[in-house]
């Protein structure tokens, strides 16, 4: 079967238990909505002026079959390339405000979007953590969140699936899935286009594409994009000179080919190169300017991703299709990032060598879409390897100790071989009970293996930022008879003058397995209205963290290393260097309808999701008696919500789009330390001081981060035809969000006593805000070009994106969304 052209995608898959009262309320609401929908669908036909208009049919692959978005029984938002252009989407974080329950924050040092769907995401962007929203391009999974920073250009469609997707998409999709489908070569005709954008902050962007049929069976497509702009964070007086933080310097190119020798077989192959040389994002300290910071170390980033993706389909005469989806990704990063933003303290860190390699193989077998019993089975294999050298140069005095010298002037985190191997099998089927009822069942079994071989956290008394620690023969001998440490001291207590030592030994090799599943019932209430209910489970893989220490006073031998590794793998003893997986269960009720002769489209979803073994950070005591913050499975959370999407073709020339999201997302159980402010944060948490919880805080009942209770958007565009036949199209979009929390502590407006800083109000919260975007497009009556002027964040609203607190510095600071940006864009096409 030939590769189908896609437009958007869909999603869905929740997990665990649901409260009866919530189900009853949800069912009643959906029944009422369905009754109203049926009444609307039987109203008299609209006037002839609107009869000629209809909402475009969009196809998605959220079920790994091609279906229309209205017929897809999942909560999914989909865009084609034109819709992405209208919303000025070039990167994933540009989608914020257009998708229900989607919120995106920026991570400074990694220059990586942190994606949250329905209140679920991850702020850990390192090789030790996994995202909770899976990212796929042409069916190939990206394990590292950095892959989501790639440019979104020349696409057939972008699909955002909300809710756990544990059956068809597997691991690390507890929050949802983002599917990108690149534009495939077209065998039928030549086409080309180009786009040029100029804007403030010296914005210069170009995108271009050429599609070339070489024969009746072979076509190639070449696409490229470049996007550059100056930074948005000004250097405070006295800062080091260099590129401003917040600058953009992105480039990408893609070559793809499609070979279809007959109606039974097609082969798609693409190679993509992505380069990011922007400076990354940096927090600014509250009490000063939102857009300035004192910089001692200008940002530097050199991030390169090379990706190879392929898909082969063969259609047998009996209607069965076998598909192979393969992918290979190789990425490397070097970076430098200022970590202090303070003229009195000097600290920076970054990747000296951070390399990542991933391979995917997937084999899929399914029958034809028209069968009464549709079935699909598949096998999935994924492997990734990470090699990391990450250095931090610390200040010469302790933050909390005033003039106390800091003995750890330099630390380096060496993970020469940290990786993952995942194998899974899955099956899903849909049976047509009657002409209007369908039932679907699915299962997936996953085995995950992780490892860290030779990982070490190393501390040094003076700055030695080198890629390889030199061997010092003076330190090899009595303390290291087996030559395991290459001249390092085995711990801080045995260090000699000028010698570096191993702080933690991170070797570990945990493994897990999990079966996830789904069940769904669909009902075609009328020819244009579908109702569905679903139950689904999700699974997020366990993660590796820092391991144990050597506490001995004698020679460090292989037996000592073996004992540490045994402790790192001993979950029962509480000394493991890993965190077990988290799981969720979701129940969802949905409505998808088309009304008023397909000029009004309404989608709605009611859901509840319960999390167990939520991966959180807690306080533990090491074997040396020191208190450390470590990840652990110590939490539960429940998320109840409602999402609505609507599109209405108003009259003969207008279009109204809207989204609405309500989230009741709270921690049910969450005992932890204050991971952001330590002792300084105690005064701001009402749960502190509980005698039953010494050294712990109880965040149970607090709101999840990046999960506003209410968020909505509304956009309207109108087409005006001029006397010369040209078209002018103004467009206005408003997006609203209620308050957003950035820390589980939910401190909010508690400035008193916070190091006597009166501007510490809302230290972990963004108040409710409204953001406006506008554009005006011109299309001539004849010709192959168009012109558009646009402005985003029209009122230049200062909107916090995340809390950017680091290194025990008790001054609150924040990441920010983009300030007001504006520009013009010209598009030219050729056929």
Protein language model regions, located:
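Solvent-exposed loop segments that connect transmembrane elements
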Residues: 232-246, 279-296, 338-351, 391-415, ...
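Membrane-embedded beta-barrel scaffold of Gram-negative outer-membrane proteins
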Residues: 311-339, 527-536, 546-547, 557-633, ...
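N-terminal periplasmic accessory domains that precede
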Residues: 92-93, 115-116, 136, 157-160, ...
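Transmembrane beta-barrel wall of Gram-negative outer-membrane proteins
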Residues: 191, 198-229, 233-278, 304-310, ...
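Gram-negative outer-membrane beta-barrel transporters
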Residues: 41-42, 435-439, 601-610, 630-744, ...
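C-terminal beta-signal and adjacent terminal beta-strands/loops
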Residues: 4, 733-752, 777-831
């Amino acid at each position: 079967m030939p590769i189908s052209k896609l437009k958007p995608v869909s999603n869905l898959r929740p997990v665990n238990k649901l409260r009866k009262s919530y189900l009853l309320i949800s069912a009643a609401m959906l029944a009422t909505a369905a009754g109203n929908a049926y009444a609307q669908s039987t109203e008299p036909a609209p006037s002839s002026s609107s009869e000629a208009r209809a909402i475009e049919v969009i196809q998605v692959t959220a079920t790994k079959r091609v279906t229309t978005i209205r017929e897809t029984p999942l909560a999914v938002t989909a865009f084609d390339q034109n819709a992405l252009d209208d919303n000025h989407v070039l990167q994933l974080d540009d989608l914020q405000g257009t998708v229900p329950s989607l919120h995106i924050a920026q991570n400074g040092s990694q220059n990586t979007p942190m994606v949250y769907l329905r209140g679920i995401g991850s702020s850990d962007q390192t090789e030790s953590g996994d995202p909770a929203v899976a990212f796929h391009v042409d069916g190939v999974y990206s394990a590292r969140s950095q892959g989501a920073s790639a440019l979104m250009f020349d696409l057939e469609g972008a699909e955002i699936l909300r809710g756990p997707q544990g059956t068809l998409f597997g691991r690390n999709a507890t929050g949802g899935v983002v599917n990108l489908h690149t534009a495939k070569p077209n065998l039928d005709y030549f086409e080309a286009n180009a786009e040029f954008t100029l804007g403030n902050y010296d914005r210069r962007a170009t995108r271009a594409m050429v599609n070339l049929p070489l024969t009746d069976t072979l076509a190639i497509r070449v696409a490229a994009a470049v996007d550059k702009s100056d930074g948005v964070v000004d250097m405070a007086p006295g800062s080091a000179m260099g590129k401003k933080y917040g600058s953009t310097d992105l480039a990408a190119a893609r070559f793809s080919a499609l070979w279809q020798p007959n109606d039974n077989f097609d082969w798609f192959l693409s190679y993509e190169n992505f380069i990011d040389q922007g400076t990354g994002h940096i927090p600014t300290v509250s009490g000063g300017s939102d857009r300035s910071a004192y910089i001692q170390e200008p940002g530097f980033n050199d991030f390169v991703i090379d990706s190879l993706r392929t898909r082969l389909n063969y259609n047998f005469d009996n209607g069965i299709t076998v598909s192979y989806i393969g992918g290979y990704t190789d990425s490397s990063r070097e970076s430098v990032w200022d970590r202090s933003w303070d003229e009195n303290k000097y600290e920076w860190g970054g990747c000296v060598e951070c390399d990542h390699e991933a391979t995917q193989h997937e084999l899929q077998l399914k029958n034809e879409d028209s069968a009464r019993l549709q079935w699909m089975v598949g096998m999935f294999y994924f492997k990734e390897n990470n090699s990391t050298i990450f250095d931090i140069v610390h200040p010469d005095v302790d933050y909390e100790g005033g003039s106390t010298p800091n003995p750890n002037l330099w630390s380096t985190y060496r993970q020469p071989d940290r990786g993952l191997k995942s194998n899974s099998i899955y099956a899903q089927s849909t049976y047509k009970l009657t002409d209007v009822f369908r039932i679907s069942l699915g299962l997936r079994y996953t085995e995950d293996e992780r490892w860290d071989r030779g990982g070490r956290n190393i501390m040094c008394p003076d700055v030695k930022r080198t890629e390889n620690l030199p061997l010092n023969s003076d330190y090899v001998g009595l303390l290291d008879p087996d030559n395991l440490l290459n001249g390092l001291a085995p711990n801080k207590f045995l260090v000699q003058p000028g010698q570096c030592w191993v702080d933690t030994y991170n070797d570990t090799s945990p493994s897990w397995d999990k079966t996830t599943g789904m069940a769904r019932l669909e009902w075609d209430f009328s020819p244009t209205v579908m109702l569905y209910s679903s139950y689904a489970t999700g699974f997020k893989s366990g993660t590796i963290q820092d391991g144990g220490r050597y506490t001995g006073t004698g020679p460090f031998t292989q037996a000592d290393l073996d004992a540490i590794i045994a402790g790192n793998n001993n979950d029962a003893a509480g000394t493991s260097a890993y965190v077990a997986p988290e799981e969720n269960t979701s129940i969802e009720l949905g409505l998808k309808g088309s009304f008023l002769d397909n000029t009004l489209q309404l989608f709605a979803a009611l859901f509840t999701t319960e999390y167990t073994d939520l991966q959180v950070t807690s306080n533990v005591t090491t074997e040396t008696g020191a208190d450390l913050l470590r990840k652990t499975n110590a939490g539960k959370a429940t998320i109840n919500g409602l999402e609505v999407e609507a599109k209405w073709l108003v009259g003969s020339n207008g279009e109204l789009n809207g989204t609405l999201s309500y989230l009741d997302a709270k921690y049910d159980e969450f005992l932890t330390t204050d991971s952001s402010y330590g002792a300084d944060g105690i005064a701001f948490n009402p749960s502190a001081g509980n005698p039953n919880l010494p050294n712990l805080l109880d965040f149970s009942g607090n709101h999840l981060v990046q999960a506003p209770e209410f968020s909505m958007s509304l956009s309207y565009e109108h087409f005006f035809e001029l006397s010369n036949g040209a078209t002018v199209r103004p467009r206005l979009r408003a997006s609203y969000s209620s308050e957003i929390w950035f820390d589980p502590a939910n401190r909010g407006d508690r400035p008193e006593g916070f190091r006597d800083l009166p501007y510490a109000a809302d230290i972990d919260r963004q108040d409710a805000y409204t953001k406006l975007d506008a554009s005006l497009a011109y299309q001539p009556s004849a010709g192959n070009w168009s012109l558009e002027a646009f402005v985003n964040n029209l009122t230049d609203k200062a909107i916090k994106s995340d809390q950017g607190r680091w290194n025990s510095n008790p001054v609150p600071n924040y990441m920010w969304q983009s300030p007001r940006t504006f520009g013009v864009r010209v598009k030219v096409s050729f056929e």
